[in-house]
Amino acid sequence: MNTNLSFSAPSQVETDCLAVVVLDHSEKDKPAAIVESADTAVRDAAKDVIATGEVTGKAFETTLLHRPAGIRAKRLLLLGGGKAKTFSAAELLKLAGAAVRTLKSKSIRAFAFALPENGVATGIDGNDGVRAIVEGAFVGNFDPDYYKSDRKDQKIDALTIVAKGDQKALEDALQTGRIVGESQNFTRDLVNEPSNRMTPTMLGERARKMAAEVGLKCEVHGADKLKELKMGAFWGVAQGSDEPPALIILRYEPEGATKDVHLGLVGKGITFDTGGISIKPADGMEKMKYDMAGGATMIGAMRAIALLKPKVRVTAIILATENMPSGKAQKPGDVQIAMSGKSIEIINTDAEGRLVLADGLCYARQLGCTHLVDAATLTGAVVVALGYVNVGLFANDDQMYERFAKANKRAGENMWRLPLDDDYKENIKSSIADIVNAGPRHGGAINAAMFLKEFAEDTPWIHLDIAGTAWMEENKPWIAKGPSGVALRSLVEFVKGWAS
Ligand code: BES
Ligand code: MN
Ligand code: ZN
């Protein structure tokens, strides 16, 4: 999708469609939908339809007017943004996605989006607004129906953002939005592929190709390296599969980076999770192709980081393998020695994510990472706790949490902190080894995080359980159902926050 800025008055922009935001300023029984444009010609064009009460400004209400009077655009799209009081850049991002999804389904290929500029209501900084619109438009332009023979792949080819302000700053914001939006779609593309088309080896290849394009260092190692590093927990999972595992390392080492800070991003890359010997029921097992979403998120985040060039050192480690039952597979009761030296009693081979991450976290620390973030589709229990809305967030350090929460707020993604009290340690006690890999069902997401905490040790660490949020169960106005690319935006903001 081509993107460009226009500094004309919205009413003077020649386009197939001009999209504008309508907000609900109503109080008590007094309805008041206001077109967020300082251009009176645009407001006049929408006056009649607003007067009928048909347009209220409620969230994701879309009204398409043809041949609107007094403006140059062929159509005017009124996008309801909800209550004016709560409107923010996060809503604007979704509205841009909704505009794209509405218009591309009508075979429109190019349109213009007017930055809400009345300001009275939104108070969104112009640069943040442009970035949000571009990100949202890219997210909305992605469809996952790759393998349909009659795939239409309708897309928006060109987006013009009508804005006011400092051209250089707005161009930068647009570039940032493009990089982050495209990187999120890159992640979604990886996650979307089925396991026969995204084996650990293929994930490694995709990471390598991307790294070469954006100038990152990349290494992809196989089973020999796992054994050399004594990654007994990772190998325990990988040993049951005929597909070789891949230990993927991406390095971003800018000049003039912040001293003494080395961020480590660790991603779960299970390209298919059958459960292993503790096999999953057939019902819904096909979804376990997205069990590499955490890894794909880290690969996509590294792409964005390489292009945005924040001055902070970042290393990503992705643990990619299948989790399969076979004559070589690990069995319940087996004991594995993790890279850190800790012994793990395998209670349930389906609790494999924490095993691969244990060695990933340990390796990141060995490589000198000073701060760690992991992302993983780790537990069904996090879906029970938080549904399909919030990412489960855990932290072993409040300062690290505060930093991450700030970045998360800027990114506008739903995340919710869950506890890690020492009292939960009971749940991962083993009678024959240091810890078990699967505790009781209650508090399942926390038990998994407690397990990981043992391997983050004293390094400040954030764990993101994205099992409920990495895959959208339904179409939304702004995003297609399927892989969401969740957490990437927060991660990129977090990394940028450390730059000197
Ligand atoms: N990959 C799953 C978790 C998952 C569930 C991801 C639903 C996405 C949607 C993970 O490896 C798993 O199987 N976890 C088990 C752990 C249990 C055996 C302790 C679970 O949540 O049931
Ligand atoms: Mn599993
Ligand atoms: Zn899994």
Predicted segments, located by residue:
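A generic structural signal for tightly packed, nonpolar segments enriched in small/aliphatic residues
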Residues: 55, 204-500
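Short amphipathic alpha-helical segment within the helicase RecA-like ATPase core
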Residues: 1-269
